[in-house]
UniProtKB/Swiss-Prot annotation:
Keywords: ATP synthesis, ATP-binding, Cell inner membrane, Cell membrane, CF(1), Hydrogen ion transport, Ion transport, Membrane, Nucleotide-binding, Translocase, Transport. The lineage of its organism: Bacteria, Pseudomonadati, Pseudomonadota, Alphaproteobacteria, Hyphomicrobiales. Its main location: membrane. It is a peripheral membrane protein. This is ATP synthase subunit beta.
Length: 478
C-alpha cells in the first residue's frame, strides 16, 4: 500500500484535482479522503503536469475544501467478492447499502481487470431457455452469450429483465448478479423486496445479517448518484460475477441500464477536458464499452450469460450509444412502442429482434423452420398494411386475407402473462416450454387454428390454453 499523501487543489463538480509533492499515483488508482465523516473514494483519471492528478469522485463532493488531505491506496478500487455478497446490496466501492451490517467476503478484488485471453475462452453454442415464447422462438439466447434489450422509455425493459431473473434464476439455480446502473431507486427497492418474497434471496434483517441460501447479489449506483459512481458500478457488478465464474459457476449477469454507463462517461468526459464526439458523447465511447463488454465472456472454467437493458434515446437505434453496444451482442431483443400501444406484452418486435444462434445446427431444424415461417407471415402482413390502410381489407385476395388473419393471431399469441406483472394484471404468469412454443406456432402457420377467434390467443401460455380460452369465449357469447 502506497502512503503518498496529497492535497485537494480544486473541485469542479464530480472532478477533483489533487496535488502530490512526490510519488504521483498511477492512473485508475483509488485515493481516499473523508467528507462529512464518510469515506470518499476518488479514482485517478489523468495526470496534469508534474505533480497534479485529476480524479473522478465516487460520491458527492459537496463539503470538500481546498488543502484537504487525500491518501493514495496504491491500487484500484477493490470490492468484496464471494458468496457473502449474495442477498446483499453493495454500492460502487463495495460498501453495503442495505443496513444489514458488513459484507462477509472471501477476498477483495480490483474492479479493473484484464479480459480473458483467447486461449481461456470457450466457444460452444447452447440455447438458454427462458420460458418466454417470443424470445425462445425468434431470438433465442445463447448460454454464456451477451443479450441486449433495446427499447425507449416505458416499453418494458425492466419488467422483461425482472421476468428473466425470475424464470432463469429459479430454473437455472445458479448465482446471479444484478447491476443497477443509473436507474430508478424505487425499482431497485422493489426488485430487492420481490427477490426476498419469491425466495430467490433471504432477508438479512431477519437472520442477523446472514443471507446463506440467497442466489443473487445486487450492486446499485442509481440515478441520484454522481456520474463517477454510475460510470463504474457496472464494473463492480462484473467483478463480483467474474469471481463466481472463475470458481466454475454459470453466472447470470443483469445490467439495467447500459446506456446510463455511457451517459455517465459522457458527463465526466467534458469535465475532464476531452473534446466531445458525435452527438456530444465522449470520444472514448467505443473503448469504454469494449473494456466492459470484453470481460463479459465464457471461459473454460465457467460462464457469464449477460442480459443488458439498453435505453434507446428518442427511439433512435442509430444513436451512437445503442449502436456501439450492438457490435458486442449475440442476441438482440428489440422492444417496440407500436407493439406496446396495441397492448401486446412483452412488446418484443418479432422482425427486428435477432439472434446469432437461430440456425438449425444449434436449435434444430423444426425450431428453425417454424421461426422462419412465423417471420415470413409477419413480414407479408407488414407489407400489406399500407394497402389495408388505404383500400381496406376487402381489396385483398383470399390468400392475402388468410395471411393477415394468421399474422394477427400470431401477433397476439406472441404475448404472454408474466409472473412479475401478476400484481398489476391479475393474470397468473406462465412459463412455456420450448417444445410447446414450437408446437403452437407450427399449428398456427399450418392453419390448424384458423377457426378460432383472435381474442383467444391474447395473453395465454400454450396453444391448449388458447383453445380452452376460445371455448370459454364461445360459451360467454352464447
Amino acid at each position: 500500500m502506497s502512503n503518498a499523501v496529497g492535497k485537494i487543489a480544486q473541485v469542479i463538480g464530480a472532478v477533483v484535482d489533487v496535488t502530490f509533492t512526490d510519488n504521483l499515483p498511477a492512473i485508475l488508482n483509488a485515493l481516499e479522503t473523508t467528507n462529512g465523516g464518510n469515506r470518499l473514494v476518488l479514482e485517478v483519471a489523468q495526470h496534469l503536469g508534474e505533480n497534479t492528478v485529476r480524479t473522478i469522485a465516487m460520491d458527492t463532493t459537496e463539503g470538500l475544501t481546498r488543502g484537504q488531505e487525500v491518501r493514495d491506496t496504491g491500487n484500484a478500487i477493490t470490492v468484496p467478492v464471494g458468496e457473502g455478497t449474495l442477498g446483499r446490496i453493495i454500492n460502487v466501492i463495495g460498501e453495503p447499502v442495505d443496513e444489514a451490517g458488513p459484507v462477509k467476503h472471501e477476498a477483495r478484488r480490483e474492479i479493473h481487470q484484464e479480459a480473458p485471453s483467447f486461449v481461456e475462452q470457450s466457444t460452444e453454442a447452447q440455447m438458454l431457455v427462458t420460458g418466454i415464447k417470443v424470445v425462445d422462438l425468434l431470438a433465442p439466447y445463447a448460454r454464456g452469450g451477451k443479450i441486449g434489450l433495446f427499447g425507449g422509455a416505458g416499453v418494458g425493459k425492466t419488467v422483461l429483465i425482472q421476468e428473466l431473473i425470475n424464470n432463469i434464476a429459479k430454473a437455472h439455480g445458479g448465482y446471479s448478479v444484478f447491476a443497477g446502473v443509473g436507474e430508478r431507486t424505487r425499482e431497485g427497492n422493489d426488485l430487492y423486496h420481490e427477490m426476498i418474497e419469491s425466495g430467490v434471496n433471504k432477508d438479512p434483517n431477519e437472520n442477523n445479517g446472514d443471507t446463506t441460501g440467497s442466489k443473487c447479489a445486487l450492486v446499485f449506483g442509481q440515478m441520484n448518484e454522481p456520474p463517477g459512481a454510475r460510470a463504474r458500478v457496472a464494473l463492480t457488478g462484473l467483478t463480483v460475477a467474474e469471481h463466481f465464474r472463475d470458481k466454475g459457476q454459470d453466472v447470470l449477469f443483469f445490467v439495467d441500464n447500459i446506456f446510463r454507463f455511457t451517459q455517465a462517461g459522457s458527463e465526466v468526459s467534458a469535465l475532464l477536458g476531452r473534446i466531445p464526439s458525435a452527438v456530444g458523447y465522449q470520444p472514448t465511447l467505443s473503448t469504454d464499452m469494449g473494456a466492459l463488454q470484453e470481460r463479459i465472456t465464457t471461459t473454460t472454467k465457467g460462464s457469464i450469460t449477460s442480459v443488458q437493458a439498453i435505453y434507446v434515446p428518442a427511439d433512435d437505434l442509430t444513436d451512437p450509444a445503442p449502436a456501439t453496444s450492438f457490435a458486442h451482442l449475440d442476441a438482440t431483443t428489440v422492444l417496440n412502442r407500436a407493439i406496446s400501444e396495441k397492448g401486446i406484452y412483452p412488446a418484443v418486435d418479432p422482425l427486428d429482434s435477432t439472434s446469432r444462434i437461430l440456425e438449425p445446427r444449434v436449435v434444430g431444424q423444426e425450431h428453425y423452420d417454424t421461426a422462419r415461417q412465423v417471420q415470413e407471415i409477419l413480414q407479408r402482413y407488414k407489407s400489406l398494411q399500407d394497402i389495408i390502410a388505404i383500400l381496406g381489407m376487402d381489396e385483398l385476395s383470399e390468400e392475402d386475407k388468410l395471411v393477415v388473419a394468421r399474422a394477427r393471431k400470431i401477433e397476439r399469441f406472441l404475448s404472454q402473462p408474466f409472473f412479475v406483472a401478476e400484481v398489476f394484471t391479475g393474470t397468473p404468469g406462465v412459463l412455456v416450454d420450448i417444445k410447446d412454443t414450437i408446437k403452437g406456432f407450427k399449428g398456427l402457420c399450418n392453419g390448424d387454428y384458423d377457426h378460432l377467434p383472435e381474442a383467444a390467443f391474447y395473453m395465454v401460455g400454450t396453444i391448449e390454453d388458447a383453445v380452452a380460452k376460445a371455448e370459454r369465449l364461445a360459451k360467454e357469447a352464447a
